[in-house]
Amino acid sequence: MKTSVFAAILGLALFAVLCSGSELQEKDLKETLLSAIMETALEAQPEERECRYLFGGCKTTSDCCKHLGCKFRDKYCAWDFTFSK
């Protein structure tokens, strides 16, 4: 009787160890897949550029913020003499 109880407890302990090991592997797999999906999603989104503020360096007028234009000679953003409403 003692032997069968000991064998049953040993079997349950072994089963618990195996289940926890497979659960850890499954959790690690989920984390790996989630991080791969997040990286792919971040790469797929276009990067938004911030506009250049007053006296910021620029190459074209589209680099500058609203109501600023790129001065061709010195290549900096300056007021383009427009007003907002």
Curated annotation (Swiss-Prot):
GO terms for molecular function: calcium channel regulator activity; ion channel inhibitor activity; potassium channel regulator activity; toxin activity. The keyword Metal-binding does not apply. The record marks 52, 71 as: May be involved in interaction with voltage sensor. This is Kappa-theraphotoxin-Gr1a. The lineage of its organism: Eukaryota, Metazoa, Ecdysozoa, Arthropoda, Chelicerata. The keyword Secreted applies. Expressed by the venom gland. InterPro entries: Huwentoxin-1. Inhibits Kv2.1/KCNB1 and Kv4.2/KCND2 voltage-gated potassium channels. Acts as a gating modifier by shifting channel openings to more depolarized voltages and acts via the occupancy of multiple binding sites on the channel. The toxin binding sites are situated on the S3-S4 extracellular linker of the channel. At least two hanatoxin molecules can occupy the Kv2.1/KCNB1 channel, and maybe more (three or four). Can also inhibit calcium channels (Cav2.1/CACNA1A). Needs to partition into the membrane in order to bind to the channel. GO terms for cellular component: extracellular region. Belongs to the neurotoxin 10 (Hwtx-1) family. 09 (HaTx) subfamily. Disulfide bonds join 51-65, 58-70, 64-77. The presence of a 'disulfide through disulfide knot' structurally defines this protein as a knottin. Residues 1-21 form the signal peptide. Residues 53-55 are annotated as: Involved in active face. Keywords: Calcium channel impairing toxin, Disulfide bond, Ion channel impairing toxin, Knottin, Neurotoxin, Potassium channel impairing toxin, Secreted, Signal, Toxin, Voltage-gated calcium channel impairing toxin, Voltage-gated potassium channel impairing toxin. The record marks 79 as: Involved in active face. It is found in: Secreted. It comes from the Eukaryota. Residues 22-49 form a propeptide.
